[in-house]
Amino acid sequence: MSEMKETTTTTVEHEYGGAEIQVLEGLEAVRKRPGMYIGSTSESGLHHLVYEIVDNSIDEALAGYCDEITVTINEGDTITVTDNGRGIPVDIQPQTGLPALEVVFTVLHAGGKFGGGGYKVSGGLHGVGASVVNALSEWLVVQVHKNGKIHQMKFARGNIVESMHIVGDTDRTGTEVTFKPDSEMFDTTVYSYDIIHTRMQQQAFLNAGLKICTFDRRAGREQQHEMCYEGGIREYAVWLNQNKTPIQEDVIYVSGHRDDASVEIAIQYNDGYNENIVSFANDVRTPEGGMHEEGFKRALTTVLNAYGKKTGIIKGDDKVSGEDCREGITAVISVKLTDAQFEGQTKAKLGNAYIRTLVTSVMNEQLDVYLEENPKVARAVLDKAMMANRAREAARKARESVRRKTGLESGQMPDKLQDCNERDASLCELYIVEGDSAAGSAIQGRDSRFQAILAMWGKMLNVEKARADKIYGNDKLYPLIVALGAGIGEEFDINKLRYHKIIIMSDADVDGAHIRTLLLTFFFRYMRPLIEHGYIYSAVPPLYKLTRGKTVRVAYSDAERDAVSAQMRGDNPNARVDISRFKGLGEMDPHELWETTMDPERRSLRRITLEDAVAADQIFTILMGEEVEPRKAWIEHNAKYADNLDF
């Protein structure tokens, strides 16, 4: 590939002292309403504490002062984050007359991120990190190596236990923070090494040359990783495609900057049918995209069409759409900018309009040059886009053909759907039921006011290996598309969705699990907003029926079976309790199905969530793709976590 202009980190020529720490407001109500600051008090919020501290170290790296970060899970699930940056300022902060270190850890919205002097670029938009972690920790200790001395402070639930004092000499610079999450504030205080490692690996990819080490020091769980990627996001794109078949060896790389903003983009196509665009602003993941993604998509479509016309690959008035151009693409977009405008505290979408112009300009200039200098890659990409275009047209014809053949016009619903009476989508549930027998029982046992039933039968299509035209022509999936009413792919409109609870109800066996995985793959690839908005659920049917006399109970696991059996025997351990295993949903009569699996007052449902789209993309590729060995390795590694798997 041709040499492209690299994005470099410019060192801020400015003394980083207490005067750079600006106080916007005092630390208030974090412990009363932690969700406002870290999203939730679940496992997600627990790990967010780690990210808040690490983000401060990343900011030092972005400014050019830090090249090594270490994150350690200690025995007892305490966390230590260490960096070799300049160290948090320890001199007096002018506004408060207090040591800057104390201000950073005790005052909300205090940090070197607001005035433009401390950091030009920062991912910590709101500057709440250190103080919020402090407020939500049972205890926290910070040590700053600066000016030849080690400065230390200790806190308990946000309150100062030890004021800043010197505990020793040092020949290095940097900050070390150790904290223990407060069990009074979180649902769990047990950390997942995999979650932390995944996040740190992502940061290492985004900051070329930055070394990040992760350690798990807990007894019986010891492991460690060292990550440093000189190729930065180019290596990230290759890593994202590791279980796919690339159609190009090289990674297309473009970069540029204007004023205080910079952009770098890495692109590698694979022979699959799905697009995987991962975007970041100041190293913060933007899962809902924003202006940088808009600029990228617009420029990609424009450049590929212009090159195709110029070379004659695209004939006459033909053109390829944006969706065609992005079939099989893996792209990493990373922008760095001052005064980043994110939508919401979760920073899910970038709003700076000028970034769209910058990204479009860089793509227009450099992608065109790359295509000119690499005609074989250009041809492969355009051939794929043209094939996608033909498939999209075939999908349109297939959609119309199926509608004509099945009479699914003018709002007519599929034969396999038994709809509910309610028309308010927020009150409606759709049960997707495996097999006609179980569907029949579900139809008889349901509450027809708000519960609809759609029967699924036969072998389902694996959408991981199929284009949209095959999906529209599939007699199993098309009725589901029509029943939901929101379309698929780029046509998907969540506002047209007819049900806000979509419940997969399949048997608790291998076949049932396979059907669930096929459906989840379909939803993830073609209706992802359903998962993102929390509309997809999995029913949890009972495994056992226990009977003693006229008393009948059900159990959802082996452990519950044993516990219920003991309860039913009571004081008589020899009492007879008949235990039978449900072989399938079809074995239950309508009353049993209602009581155990469909009654909102008694049923058990699992909401399918999407914590990390990148991880989910890889999991579905491994589970449903062509390669056997990665699938086998993944199953073997995760078998012990089977009860906790979540996409």
Model-derived features with residue positions:
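GHKL-family ATPase ATP-binding module
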Residues: 1-19, 27, 49-51, 59-61, ...
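Conserved short strand/loop->alpha-helix "switch" segment adjacent to the catalytic nucleotide/phosphoryl-transfer site
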Residues: 32-51
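A short glycine-centered beta->alpha linker in the GHKL/HATPase_c
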Residues: 87-92
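Short adenine-binding "F-helix/F-box" segment of the Bergerat
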Residues: 93-94, 101
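Helical (often loop-to-helix) elements that flank the catalytic cores of nucleotide-handling enzymes
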Residues: 94, 341-355, 554-560, 564, ...
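C-terminal interaction appendages of subunits in large macromolecular complexes
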Residues: 390-409, 424-429, 440-446, 459, ...
